[in-house]
């Protein structure tokens, strides 16, 4: 669904089953949706057995003790369980959302699971959230809205988040609450006003788990206002004019569309005044700065995780053709990336001192290699390609408009889950705003940039390696489908999950300062 305004695609926007792409070439959208539903229904129970079985094994046999940051998170939750609500560990840098949720979870489950340890019960918070609540409550409504673009069973298996289903970290519920906000903002299940207030509430709650979620709260607000303004103000191809229409509509409908989210910004501003910093606790090791190369780290991770979505002969050919066609421009783009590597790479002491994370090995052996041919000559072109992937995979999913005629859709709730040129720009800016200030090279920080990017991607139906050959005029049209790519995305995530789990289970080493064996995670 790339060009919603094109006349030949009005059938698709209004719910048509077969989409004619070219003479002799079509997509059967209804068949793709049915296959997607069947696959998700069949895979989900097996996935639950795998993840909960793995959870039991890891918790009992691999790390039946507090692991890395868990010592702070578990300790603070136990402090709350003891009733010491105003005692705070100064080494903790995130708000108390996880500890309040953990306290509630413990109070509910401990009477039912008396023989279970406190550690296991608290870890169940993330296991339940990621494996049950996230796919069924958060992702399912968007899937029903846009079933040919992603599978919930794949996104719940996303490796950067699935790792923390076994541990007591803030990332799972931070993601759940902010994506819940987006889900409600897109689908409006309770009517316009109630849905927006509920969406804003979930966005605000998510900030109790990670402060930078306030940025994504702003993005969700823009999405909500934009989807209403597209219809009310009849967006067209005049880009700057659409910005003005969006602004006018946000002012006219401030109380309904903007105020609920604006209250979150007011609360966050008061928090900054009170705390004098975005970081709680250990501010000395988490000073914000300009770490521009983080953007390329993020794009590189997203490119690797999205291989099944973009990889094809045609996509690679498109990159090479652009490189050949714009050689001078590409040269300066790569030169600019080299300058970013040279002057905007921050080496945090934690990164070089902690060999329990993949980033330690990636940074030491590849990203910051002492040979310049690798650090600059290899990594700069890689970052250039990854940036191309990030931008180009979104381009076919952009919602386009006609210069004169308005969209055939009259109800904002029926708009496809696509970005316009405005929200497309906002997504990039929000990604910059969340990753650039961080001094730490932490893949966990790329979870939300990934989900906000992935949920707006319309999966390609192009064959991965073959060529599309439309049927002849006297033959049945050739039907292409995105089902195989969506299935491969799920398989790709599961393979990464299994490999990282094997490394986590099989490879251990001692630390002089720790009583238990240490292991490697993201």
Swiss-Prot record:
Which Gene Ontology BP annotations are present? dolichol-linked oligosaccharide biosynthetic process
**Membrane-spanning parts:** 36-56, 119-139, 142-162, 172-192, 205-225, 254-274, 292-312, 330-350, 373-393, 421-441, 446-466, 485-505
The principal localisation class reads endoplasmic reticulum
Q: Does the keyword Endoplasmic reticulum apply?
A: yes
Tell me the membrane topology, using the record's own terms: Multi-pass membrane protein
Q: What Gene Ontology cellular component terms go with this record?
A: endoplasmic reticulum membrane
- Annotated InterPro entries: Alg10
Alphabetized, the UniProt keywords read: Endoplasmic reticulum, Glycoprotein, Glycosyltransferase, Membrane, Transferase, Transmembrane, Transmembrane helix
GO MF annotation list:
dolichyl pyrophosphate Glc2Man9GlcNAc2 alpha-1,2-glucosyltransferase activity
- Pathway per the UniProt entry: Protein modification; protein glycosylation
Q: Name one Pfam family in it.
A: DIE2_ALG10
Residues modified by glycosylation: 275
> What EC numbers are recorded for this enzyme?
2.4.1.256
Subcellular location field? Endoplasmic reticulum membrane
| Catalytic activity, reaction form | an alpha-D-Glc-(1->3)-alpha-D-Glc-(1->3)-alpha-D-Man-(1->2)-alpha-D-Man-(1->2)-alpha-D-Man-(1->3)-[alpha-D-Man-(1->2)-alpha-D-Man-(1->3)-[alpha-D-Man-(1->2)-alpha-D-Man-(1->6)]-alpha-D-Man-(1->6)]-beta-D-Man-(1->4)-beta-D-GlcNAc-(1->4)-alpha-D-GlcNAc-diphospho-di-trans,poly-cis-dolichol + a di-trans,poly-cis-dolichyl beta-D-glucosyl phosphate = a alpha-D-Glc-(1->2)-alpha-D-Glc-(1->3)-alpha-D-Glc-(1->3)-alpha-D-Man-(1->2)-alpha-D-Man-(1->2)-alpha-D-Man-(1->3)-[alpha-D-Man-(1->2)-alpha-D-Man-(1->3)-[alpha-D-Man-(1->2)-alpha-D-Man-(1->6)]-alpha-D-Man-(1->6)]-beta-D-Man-(1->4)-beta-D-GlcNAc-(1->4)-alpha-D-GlcNAc-diphospho-di-trans,poly-cis-dolichol + a di-trans,poly-cis-dolichyl phosphate + H(+)
The superkingdom listed in its UniProt entry is Eukaryota
User: Any idea what job this protein has?
Assistant: Dol-P-Glc:Glc(2)Man(9)GlcNAc(2)-PP-Dol alpha-1,2-glucosyltransferase that operates in the biosynthetic pathway of dolichol-linked oligosaccharides, the glycan precursors employed in protein asparagine (N)-glycosylation. The assembly of dolichol-linked oligosaccharides begins on the cytosolic side of the endoplasmic reticulum membrane and finishes in its lumen. The sequential addition of sugars to dolichol pyrophosphate produces dolichol-linked oligosaccharides containing fourteen sugars, including two GlcNAcs, nine mannoses and three glucoses.
Under the heading PANTHER family, the entry gives: ALPHA-1,2-GLUCOSYLTRANSFERASE ALG10, DOL-P-GLC:GLC(2)MAN(9)GLCNAC(2)-PP-DOL ALPHA-1,2-GLUCOSYLTRANSFERASE-RELATED
> Record's family?
Belongs to the ALG10 glucosyltransferase family.
Its protein name is Dol-P-Glc:Glc(2)Man(9)GlcNAc(2)-PP-Dol alpha-1,2-glucosyltransferase
Q: Which organism is it from?
A: Candida glabrata (strain ATCC 2001 / BCRC 20586 / JCM 3761 / NBRC 0622 / NRRL Y-65 / CBS 138) (Yeast)
């Amino acid at each position: 669904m790339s060009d919603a305004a094109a006349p030949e695609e009005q059938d698709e926007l209004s719910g048509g089953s077969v989409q004619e792409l070219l003479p002799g070439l079509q997509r059967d959208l209804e068949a793709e949706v049915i296959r997607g539903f069947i696959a998700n229904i069949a895979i989900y129970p097996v996935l639950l057995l795998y993840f909960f079985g793995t959870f039991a094994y890891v918790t009992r046999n691999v790390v039946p003790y507090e692991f890395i940051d868990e010592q702070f998170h578990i300790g603070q939750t136990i402090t709350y369980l003891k009733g010491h609500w105003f005692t705070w560990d100064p080494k903790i840098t995130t708000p108390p959302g996880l500890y309040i949720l953990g306290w509630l979870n413990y109070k509910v489950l401990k009477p039912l699971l008396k023989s279970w340890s406190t550690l296991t019960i608290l870890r169940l918070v993330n296991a339940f959230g990621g494996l049950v609540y996230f796919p069924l409550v958060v992702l399912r409504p968007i899937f029903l809205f846009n079933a040919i673009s992603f599978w919930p069973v794949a996104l719940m298996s996303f490796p950067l988040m699935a790792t923390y289903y076994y541990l007591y970290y803030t990332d799972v519920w931070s993601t759940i609450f902010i994506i819940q906000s987006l889900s409600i903002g897109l689908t409006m299940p309770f009517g316009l006003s109630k849905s927006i207030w509920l969406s804003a509430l979930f966005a605000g709650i998510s900030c109790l788990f990670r402060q930078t979620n306030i940025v994504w709260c702003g993005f969700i607000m823009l999405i909500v206002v934009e989807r209403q303004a597209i219809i009310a103000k009849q967006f067209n191809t005049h880009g700057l004019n659409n910005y003005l229409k969006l602004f006018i509509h946000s002012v006219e409908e401030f109380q309904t569309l903007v105020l609920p989210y604006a209250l979150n910004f007011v609360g966050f501003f008061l928090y900054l005044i009170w705390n004098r910093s975005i970081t709680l606790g250990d501010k000395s090791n988490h000073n914000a700065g300009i770490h521009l190369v983080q953007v390329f780290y993020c794009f590189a991770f997203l490119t690797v995780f999205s291989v099944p979505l973009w990889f094809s002969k045609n996509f690679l050919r498109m990159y090479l053709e652009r490189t050949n066609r714009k050689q001078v421009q590409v040269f300066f783009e790569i030169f600019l990336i080299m300058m970013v590597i040279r002057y905007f790479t921050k080496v945090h002491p934690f990164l070089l001192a902690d060999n329990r994370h993949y980033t330690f090995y990636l940074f030491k052996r590849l990203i910051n290699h002492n040979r310049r041919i690798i650090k600059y000559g290899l990594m700069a072109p890689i970052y250039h390609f990854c940036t191309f992937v990030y931008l180009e995979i979104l381009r076919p999913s952009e919602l386009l408009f006609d210069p004169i005629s308005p969209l055939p859709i009259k109800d904002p709730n029926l708009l496809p889950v696509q970005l316009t040129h405005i929200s497309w720009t906002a997504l990039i800016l929000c990604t910059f705003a969340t990753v650039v200030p961080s001094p730490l090279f932490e893949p966990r920080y790329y979870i939300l940039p990934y989900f906000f990017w992935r949920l707006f991607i319309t999966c390609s139906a192009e064959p991965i390696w073959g060529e599309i050959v439309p049927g002849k005029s006297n033959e049945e049209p050739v039907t292409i489908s995105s089902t195989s790519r969506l299935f491969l995305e799920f398989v790709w995530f599961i393979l990464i999950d299994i490999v990282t789990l094997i490394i986590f289970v099989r490879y251990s080493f001692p630390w002089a300062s720790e009583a238990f064996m240490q292991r490697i995670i993201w």
